């Protein structure tokens, strides 16, 4: 889809961005249902795990992270991401959404342990990572929207600390989310993200 913007003619691939939003909404709904709907006994039966015995506050954290990520990623996809989304990136991001939204819930929502200092660390890491990722993108977006900066590389703001500070933020918030699950298998996700 072509659209005239202040910066000229831009291909937005709005269809894929809206499809991201819809799929991400479905993932969030599935995660919520696994955490809080007693009617979803098929998940318990498949994994032979009783999700109803999971710590309620851990479930709230897992779902809250999902909602926060949903809002952040839609801000990024619909507002900050100006370029066309290639189809392979669409499928890669969709797979990542499934791992975060549904995978972390499947791994952590059944854990009965009370929240502890490790969870506080996970929450802080999630918040700090979200800040580095999103705020750095907002700063770069402001820079790119200035016609005087056309063709220039952005090395100010948070990007003055690292070339890919936004990706550092990704690794932090995903690691924080994995920590909240209290499941070592969740550690595979941030490891895969760094490769």
Where are these regions (language model features)?
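Alpha-helical transmembrane segments in multi-pass membrane proteins
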Residues: 1-100
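Membrane-water interface of transmembrane alpha-helices
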Residues: 68-79, 132-144
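Hydrophobic transmembrane alpha-helices
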Residues: 5-49, 108-139, 148-195
């Amino acid at each position: 889809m072509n659209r005239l913007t202040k910066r000229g003619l831009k291909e937005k691939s709005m269809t894929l961005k809206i499809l991201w939003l819809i799929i991400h909404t479905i993932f969030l709904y599935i995660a919520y249902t696994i955490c809080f709907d007693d009617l979803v006994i098929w998940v318990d039966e498949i994994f032979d795990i009783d999700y109803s015995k999971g710590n309620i506050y851990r479930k709230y954290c897992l779902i809250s992270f999902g909602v926060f990520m949903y809002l952040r990623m839609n801000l990024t996809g619909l507002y900050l991401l100006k370029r066309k989304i290639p189809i392979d990136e669409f499928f890669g991001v969709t797979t990542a959404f499934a791992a975060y939204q549904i995978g972390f819930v499947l791994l952590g929502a059944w854990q009965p342990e009370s929240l502890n200092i490790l969870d506080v660390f996970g929450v802080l890491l999630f918040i700090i990572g979200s800040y580095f990722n999103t705020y750095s993108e907002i700063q770069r977006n402001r820079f790119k929207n200035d016609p005087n900066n056309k063709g220039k590389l952005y090395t100010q703001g948070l990007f003055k600390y690292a070339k890919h500070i936004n990706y550092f933020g990704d690794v932090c918030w995903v690691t924080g989310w994995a920590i909240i699950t209290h499941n070592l298998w969740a550690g595979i996700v941030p490891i895969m993200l760094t490769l």
